[in-house]
From Swiss-Prot:
Belongs to the liprin family. Liprin-alpha subfamily. Residues 1-23, 201-239, 521-587, 623-815, 1155-1192 are annotated as: Disordered. It is found in: Cytoplasm; Cytoplasmic vesicle, Secretory vesicle, Acrosome. This is Liprin-alpha-3. The modification Phosphoserine is found at residues 17, 142, 207, 431, 507, 639, 644, 667, 682, 735, 792, 1121, 1162. GO terms for biological process: neurotransmitter secretion; regulation of short-term neuronal synaptic plasticity; synapse organization; synaptic vesicle docking; synaptic vesicle exocytosis. The keyword ATP-binding does not apply. Pfam families: SAM_1 (PF00536), SAM_2 (PF07647). Residues 836-902, 951-1015, 1039-1108 form the SAM domain. Expressed in the head of epididymal sperm but not in testicular sperm (at protein level). Also detected in epididymis, brain, intestine and lungs. Residues 26-133, 161-501, 595-643, 1012-1038 form a coiled coil. Forms homodimers and heterodimers with liprins-alpha and liprins-beta. Interacts with the second PTPase domain of PTPRD, PTPRF and PTPRS. Binds RIMS1, RIMS2, RIMS3 and RIMS4. Keywords: Coiled coil, Cytoplasm, Cytoplasmic vesicle, Phosphoprotein, Repeat.
Length: 1192
C-alpha cells in the first residue's frame, strides 16, 4: 500500500492574507476542499484498514485456536504413540529373548537326545554279550548276574518319555508363538493405520495453514498498516511452529521407520524361530523314527536272544550229559584203582598178620600153662560187658519213654492252651452276651418298674381322689339335709305367717328387718318394679331365678373343663349363702305379693335342690373325665415346652373365675348381686403361710379375693358356692400332695428316718407335672425329704434354662439349706457312700464336687443311690450321664473314689481325724465344739466341710495366675480341673486337653502341685503364709508370680520384671527346683549378656534369697554355685511322681492319695510328715504321710 502524505500548511498564511485578501481566500478554499477530500479518502482508507484488521484478528484468533488444537492433538497423540511404540518395542525384545531361550532349550534338548542316543548305543554295544549270557547267568544263579537289559529298557523308556514331553512343550510353545505373532501383527496394523491418519492430519493442517498465510500477506501489503504487520509476524511464528511440528513429525516418521525395521527384524527372527521350530519338529520326528527303529531292533534282538537261549539250553543239556558220563567213568576208574590198592594193602596186612600169628602162636604155646586164669578173667569181663549193655539198653528205653512222655505233655500243654484260649474267647463272648442280656433285662425291668410305680401312684391318687369326692359328696348331702331342714323351717314360718292377720305382714319402714335386707338383690333394670302387682312380681322373680340358675350352670360347665385348680379355701361352708337365701326369701315374704306365693317359693326351693343334685352329678362326671383332661394337658405341655409352663404359672396365679373361658365369657344377664363376701381365713391357712412354702410357689395357686378387679363380673351365689367347694377339694389335695407336716422344711434329721410312708394324691395338673418327676424320686423313705415342700424343688434347683428366676432368692436358700441338711445327716450317721440315697448324692455332686448343672440333672435322672454312682464305670459315665470329656470323667471318678475311701468302715484313721481330713465324725464334731465353747464361737458344718474351697474356679482364677500361667485358665476352666485332679494329670492330658505344650510350664505346674502337697492342700494356710511373706524375704516356697516380680523390681530391675508375666516363675519353682539358678532367671528376665552389672546383682540377690527363704543350701566346695542334683527329667519322671502307670491311671485304687504321696518321697524332695495329735510315733498308721483330703 502507498502512504499518501498530506500537504503542509504554511504558517505564513495569515501574513499573506493581510497582503492579498483574494489570493488568500482562494487558497483557503482550495485548501479546505483538498482537506475535505483528503479527509474523506483517509476515512475510507481507515474504514478499510479497520475492516482488514478485524478480519486479520479473527483469522489470527482462528489460527491461534487451530494452533492450540494442533498442539493439543500433537501432545496427546504423539506421546501416546511413542509410549505405545516403546511398549511394543519392549514386548518385541521380550519375545526375542523368549525365542532365544526357546532356541537354547531346543538346542539343549537336541544335545540331550543326541547324548541319550549315544548312551543307548554304548549300552547296546557294551552289553551285547551280557544280554546273550543273561539267561545262562540266571540259570546258574551267579551272584553277580545283574541284568543289563533292564538298563537298556529304562534308557529306552526314559528316551520315549523325554521325546513325548519335548513334543508337548514344542507344540505348546508353537501355539503361544503363533498367538503372539497374531497379536503383534494386529498391533502393527493398528500402528500403521494410526501413522497414516497422522500423516493425513498433518497434510491437512499444512494446507490449511498455508492458505490463511497467503491471504494475510495480501491484506497486509494492500493495507500497509501497523496491525497487519503484527499479524504477519504472528503468522511467521505460526509457520515456525509448524516447521517445528513438521520436524517433529519427521522425527516421528523416522522413529516409526526404525520401529518398522525393528518389527521386520523381529518378524525375521520369528521366521527363523519358526524355521528352527520346524527343524526341531523334524529332529523330533527323526528321533521318533529312530526310537521306532530302536524298538524294532530291540524286538529283533529279543527274538535272536530267545533263539540263542534255546540253542544254548540244548547245548547245555548235551554238555551236562557228557560231563555226567565223563564223571561216571572217572569215578569208576578211581574206584577200581582204590580197590586195587586196597587189595595190595590187604595182602600186605595178611602177610604181616601171618607173621604176627606165628609169633603169637609161639607165645601162646609158651603161656599155655596160665590159660585157665585168663579164661576166668575173660568170662568176668564178658559178664560185666553184658550187664553194661543191659543197663545201657534200659537207659535208652527210659530215655525213649521220657521223650515220648515229654512229647505227650507238650501236646497236652498245647491242647490245654488252645482250650484255654477257646475258653477265654467263649467266656468273653458269654460275658458280653450276659452283659448285654443283663443290661437289656435291667432296662426292661426299670421301664416295667417305672410303669408299675406310675400305675401304682395313679391308682393311689385316684383312690384318694375318690375318697375326697366321697367326703365332698357326704358334705353336699349334709348341706342338702340342712337345706331341707331350712326349707321345713321356712315352711313352718310360712304357715305361721298364714295364720297372722294382714296388718302384721309388713314391718315399719325404719325397722331392723327392713334395714337388714336393704341390700337384697334387685331386679334387672329393664324389669318393671310392681310391689303391689302379684302376677308381675311372681313372673319377674321366677324369670330371675331361672336365669340365674341357667347362667350359673353354664358358668360351671364352661369353667370345669379348663383344667385349672381353684384356689385353696376352708372346707367348712359358712353361713353367707344361707344369709343370702334368707335375704332373698325375706324380701319376697315382706312384699305384699309374697303372702299368696307360698307354692312359688316351694317350687323355687325344689329347683335349688335339683340344682344341687345336678352339681353333685357334674362333680362326679368331672372326676371321671379328670384322666382324659390330664392326658390332653400333658400332650399340650409337652408340645408347647416352656411357654406352657409360663401359662401354667400365670393361670395358677389367677382365681378360677379369671382363667380360660371364664375370662372370655360375658357377664350373666340376670346376675344382679354384688361381689360375694370372702370367707374368713382359716387357722390352717395361717400356719401354712407362716411355716411352710406358699401354695402359689408350691404349684397350687392361692386365690385371695378378686385378683384383677373390674375384669370379670361378680359371680352368682351358686357359682361362689361351687368355687368354695372346689377350693376346699383343691386344698385337701394340695395338703395331701405335700406329704409333710406344716413345718416340713424345718424337720429334724431324726424324723427323716422315722417318718412313715405317705401316699400322695394329685390333681390333674399335679399328676401331669408329677409324671415327669417319677424317674427322679429317691427311695420311699426319703420322699418326704427330697420333696419337702414343693413338687418342683428339684427341677428348679438345677434348672439350666434359668427357670429358677421365677422364684425368689428365699426358695433357693431353702433348697440349699435342705441339701446341706441331707449331707449333714449323712455325715452324722457315718453312712458309707453306697448307702446314700439319690437326693444326697445329687446334693453332694452340686455342693461338694461342684459339677455343672447339666451333669447334676443327668445324675439326678440316672443315679438313684450312692451304690449306683460308686459302681459306674468309665464307659457307663460316658453313656448314661453323657460326660464325654475325659477330664470331667476323671474329676467325677476321683470324687467318687475319695468319698468311697472316706466313708468306708475300713478307712484308715488318719482320714477321719481333724488334722488329716475335713470329713469328720459326729464324736469329733462334738469334741471340737466342746473345745471351742469358751470362745463362744459357733462352728457350722458348712465351715468345716468347706464346699468349693479349692474347686476349678479357684484353680483357674487364683492358683494358675499365682503360678504365672494365666494363659491356660480357659482350658483348665473348661476341663473343670480342681485341686483333687492336679496330682493325676499326665503329660498327654496336659498337652492335648489343657494345651500346655511348653515343657518348662509343665515343670512349673509340677512344682506348684508340690507346694500344695507340702501345705497339705490347705488353702487358708497358703493364703496366710503368702500374706506373712508379702513384705519379708521368707518362705519363698509360697511366693506367687506377682511377688517374684515385685522382688525383682525391688532389686532395681524393674524394666526386666515385666518379662516374668505368663512365664511360669513362682516361689515353689525357686525353692524346690535344685537345677534352677540365677542364669535361668536372667534368661527368663531377658537380661542381655552384655549387662554384666545387672547379672552380678541378680546372682548376689538370688543367692541371698535362696539362703534366707528356702531350704536349699550353697555348695561347700564352691562359694557361688549351688548343689545340683540330677536332672528333673530323671528325678521326677511322671510315672514315679504319680505313683501309677499311664495305663492304670484310668482306674485308681481307693487309697490313691497315700500311694501318690508315698511315691513322692524321693531323696531330692523330702516331704514333711504330718502326724495327727492323738497318734503316737509307734503306730503303724503314722508311718505314711498323712495327706489332707480336700473338697472341691
Amino acid at each position: 500500500m502507498m502512504c499518501e502524505v498530506m500537504p503542509t500548511i504554511s504558517e505564513d498564511g495569515r501574513r499573506g492574507s493581510a497582503l492579498g485578501p483574494d489570493d488568500a481566500g482562494g487558497e483557503l478554499e482550495r485548501l479546505m476542499v483538498t482537506m475535505l477530500t483528503e479527509r474523506e479518502r483517509l476515512l475510507e482508507t481507515l474504514r478499510e484498514a479497520q475492516d482488514g484488521l478485524a478480519t486479520a484478528q479473527l483469522r489470527l484468533r482462528e489460527l491461534g485456536h487451530e494452533k492450540d488444537s494442533l498442539q493439543r492433538q500433537l501432545s496427546i497423540a504423539l506421546p501416546q504413540e511413542f509410549a505405545a511404540l516403546t511398549k511394543e518395542l519392549n514386548l518385541c525384545r521380550e519375545q526375542l529373548l523368549e525365542r532365544e531361550e526357546e532356541i537354547a532349550e531346543l538346542k539343549a534338548e537336541r544335545n540331550n537326545t543326541r547324548l541319550l542316543l549315544e548312551h543307548l548305543e554304548c549300552l547296546v554295544s557294551r552289553h551285547e554279550r551280557s544280554l546273550r549270557m543273561t539267561v545262562v547267568k540266571r540259570q546258574a544263579q551267579s551272584p553277580g548276574g545283574v541284568s543289563s537289559e533292564v538298563e537298556v529298557l529304562k534308557a529306552l523308556k526314559s528316551l520315549f518319555e523325554h521325546h513325548k514331553a519335548l513334543d508337548e512343550k514344542v507344540r505348546e510353545r508353537l501355539r503361544m508363538a503363533l498367538e503372539r505373532v497374531a497379536v503383534l501383527e494386529e498391533e502393527l496394523e493398528l500402528s500403521n493405520q494410526e501413522a497414516l491418519n497422522l500423516r493425513d492430519q498433518l497434510s491437512r493442517r499444512r494446507s490449511g495453514l498455508e492458505e490463511p498465510g497467503k491471504d494475510g500477506d495480501g491484506q497486509t501489503l494492500a493495507n500497509g498498516l501497523g496491525p497487519v504487520g503484527e499479524s504477519s509476524r504472528r503468522t511467521a511464528e505460526l509457520e515456525e511452529a509448524l516447521e517445528r511440528q513438521r520436524a517433529e513429525v519427521c522425527q516421528l516418521r523416522e522413529r516409526l521407520a526404525v520401529l518398522c525395521r525393528q518389527m521386520s527384524q523381529l518378524e525375521e527372527e520369528l521366521g527363523t524361530a519358526h524355521r528352527e521350530l520346524g527343524k526341531a519338529e523334524e529332529a523330533n520326528s527323526k528321533l521318533q523314527r529312530d526310537l521306532k527303529e530302536a524298538l524294532a531292533q530291540r524286538e529283533d534282538m529279543e527274538e535272536r536272544i530267545t533263539t540263542l537261549e534255546k540253542r544254548y539250553l540244548s547245548a547245555q543239556r548235551e554238555a551236562t550229559s557228557l560231563h555226567d558220563a565223563n564223571d561216571k567213568l572217572e569215578n569208576e576208574l578211581a574206584s577200581k584203582e582204590s580197590l586195587y590198592r586196597q587189595s595190595e594193602e590187604k595182602s600186605r596186612q595178611l602177610a604181616e598178620w601171618l607173621d604176627d600169628a606165628k609169633q603169637k602162636l609161639q607165645q601162646t604155646l609158651q603161656k599155655a600153662e596160665t590159660l585157665p586164669e585168663i579164661e576166668a578173667q575173660l568170662a568176668q569181663r564178658v559178664a560185666a560187658l553184658n550187664k553194661a549193655e543191659e543197663r545201657h539198653g534200659n537207659f535208652e528205653e527210659r530215655l525213649r519213654q521220657l521223650e515220648a512222655q515229654l512229647e505227650e505233655k507238650n501236646q497236652e500243654l498245647q491242647r490245654a492252651r488252645q482250650r484255654e484260649k477257646m475258653n477265654d474267647d467263649h467266656n468273653k463272648r458269654l460275658s458280653e452276651t450276659v452283659d448285654k442280656l443283663l443290661s437289656e433285662s435291667n432296662e426292661r425291668l426299670q421301664l416295667h418298674l417305672k410303669e408299675r410305680m406310675g400305675a401304682l401312684e395313679e391308682k393311689n391318687s385316684l383312690s384318694e381322689e375318690i375318697a375326697n369326692m366321697k367326703k365332698l359328696q357326704d358334705e353336699l348331702l349334709l348341706n342338702k339335709e340342712q337345706l331341707l331342714a331350712e326349707m321345713e323351717r321356712m315352711q313352718m314360718e310360712i304357715d305361721q305367717l298364714r295364720g297372722r292377720p294382714p296388718s302384721y305382714s309388713r314391718s315399719l319402714p325404719g325397722s331392723a328387718l327392713e334395714l337388714r335386707y336393704s341390700q337384697a338383690p334387685t331386679l334387672p333394670s329393664g324389669a318393671p318394679l310392681d310391689p303391689y302387682g302379684a302376677g308381675s312380681g311372681r313372673a319377674g322373680k321366677r324369670g330371675r331365678w331361672s336365669g340365674a340358675k341357667d347362667e350359673s350352670s353354664k358358668d360351671w360347665d364352661r369353667s370345669t373343663p379348663a383344667g385349672s385348680i381353684p384356689p385353696p379355701f376352708p372346707g367348712e361352708l359358712d353361713g353367707s349363702d344361707e344369709e343370702e337365701t334368707e335375704g332373698m326369701f325375706g324380701a319376697e315374704l315382706l312384699s305384699p305379693s309374697g303372702q299368696a306365693d307360698v307354692q312359688t317359693l316351694a317350687i323355687m326351693l325344689q329347683e335349688q335342690l335339683e340344682a344341687i343334685n345336678k352339681e353333685i352329678k357334674l362333680i362326679q362326671e368331672e372326676k371321671e373325665t379328670t384322666e382324659q383332661r390330664a392326658e390332653e394337658l400333658e400332650s399340650r405341655v409337652s408340645s408347647s415346652g416352656l411357654d406352657s409352663l409360663g401359662r401354667y404359672r400365670s393361670s395358677c396365679s389367677l382365681p378360677p373365675s379369671l382363667t380360660t373361658s371364664t375370662l372370655a365369657s360375658p357377664s350373666p344377664p340376670s346376675s344382679g348381686h354384688s361381689t360375694p363376701r370372702l370367707a374368713p381365713p382359716s387357722p390352717a391357712r395361717e400356719t401354712d403361710k407362716t411355716n411352710h412354702v406358699p401354695k402359689d410357689e408350691a404349684g397350687v395357686p392361692r386365690g385371695e379375693g378378686p385378683a384383677i378387679p373390674g375384669d370379670t363380673p361378680p359371680p352368682t351365689p351358686r357359682s361362689a358356692r361351687l368355687e368354695r367347694m372346689t377350693q376346699a377339694l383343691a386344698l385337701q389335695a394340695g395338703s395331701l400332695e405335700d406329704g409333710a407336716p406344716p413345718r416340713g422344711s424345718e424337720s429334724t434329721p431324726d424324723s427323716l428316718h422315722k417318718a412313715p410312708k405317705r401316699k400322695s394324691i394329685k390333681s390333674s395338673i399335679g399328676r401331669l407335672f408329677g409324671k415327669k418327676e417319677k424317674g427322679r424320686m429317691g427311695p420311699p423313705g426319703r420322699e418326704s425329704v427330697s420333696l419337702a415342700g414343693t413338687p418342683s424343688d428339684e427341677t428348679l434347683a438345677t434348672d439350666p434354662l434359668g427357670l429358677a428366676k421365677l422364684t425368689g432368692p428365699g426358695d433357693k436358700d431353702r433348697r440349699n439349706k435342705r441339701k446341706h441338711e441331707l449331707l449333714e445327716e449323712a455325715c452324722r450317721q457315718g453312712l458309707p457312700f453306697a448307702a446314700w440315697d439319690g437326693p444326697t448324692v445329687v446334693s453332694w455332686l452340686e455342693l461338694w464336687v461342684g459339677m455343672p448343672a447339666w451333669y447334676v440333672a443327668a445324675c439326678r435322672a440316672n443315679v438313684k443311690s450312692g451304690a449306683i454312682m460308686a459302681n459306674l464305670s468309665d464307659t457307663e459315665i460316658q453313656r448314661e450321664i453323657g460326660i464325654s470329656n475325659p477330664l470331667h470323667r476323671l474329676k467325677l471318678r476321683l470324687a467318687i473314689q475319695e468319698m468311697v475311701s472316706l466313708t468306708s468302715p475300713s478307712a484308715p484313721a488318719s482320714s477321719r481325724t481333724p488334722t488329716g481330713n475335713v470329713w469328720m465324725t459326729h464324736e469329733e464334731m462334738e469334741s471340737l465344739t466342746a473345745a471351742t465353747k469358751p470362745e463362744t464361737k459357733e462352728i457350722s458344718w458348712e465351715q468345716i466341710l468347706a464346699y468349693g474351697d479349692m474347686n476349678h474356679e479357684w484353680v483357674g482364677n487364683d492358683w494358675l495366675p499365682s503360678l504365672g500361667l494365666p494363659q491356660y485358665r480357659s482350658y483348665f476352666m473348661e476341663s473343670l480341673v480342681d485341686a483333687r485332679m492336679l496330682d493325676h494329670l499326665n503329660k498327654k492330658e496336659l498337652r492335648e486337653q489343657l494345651k500346655m505344650v511348653d515343657s518348662f510350664h509343665r515343670v512349673s505346674l509340677h512344682y506348684g502341685i508340690m507346694c500344695l502337697k507340702r501345705l497339705n492342700y490347705d488353702r487358708k494356710d497358703l493364703e496366710r503364709r503368702r500374706e506373712e511373706s508379702q513384705t519379708q524375704i521368707r518362705d519363698v516356697m509360697v511366693w506367687s508370680n506377682e511377688r517374684v516380680m515385685g522382688w525383682v523390681s525391688g532389686l532395681g530391675l524393674k524394666e526386666f520384671a515385666t518379662n516374668l508375666t505368663e512365664s511360669g516363675v513362682h516361689g515353689a519353682l525357686l525353692a524346690l527346683d535344685e537345677t534352677f539358678d540365677y542364669s535361668d532367671l536372667a534368661l527368663l528376665l531377658q537380661i542381655p549378656t552384655q549387662n554384666a552389672q545387672a547379672r552380678q546383682l541378680l546372682e548376689k540377690e538370688f543367692s541371698n534369697l535362696i539362703s534366707l527363704g528356702t531350704d536349699r543350701r550353697l555348695d561347700e566346695d564352691s562359694a557361688k554355685s549351688f548343689s545340683r542334683s540330677p536332672s528333673w527329667r530323671k528325678m521326677f519322671r511322671e510315672k514315679d511322681l504319680r505313683g501309677v502307670t499311664p495305663d492304670s491311671a484310668e482306674m485308681l485304687p481307693p487309697n490313691f492319695r497315700s500311694a501318690a504321696a508315698g511315691a513322692l518321697g524321693s531323696p531330692g524332695l523330702p516331704l514333711r510328715k504330718l502326724q495327727p495329735e492323738g497318734q503316737t510315733s509307734g503306730s503303724s498308721r503314722a508311718d505314711g504321710v498323712s495327706v489332707r483330703t480336700y473338697s472341691c
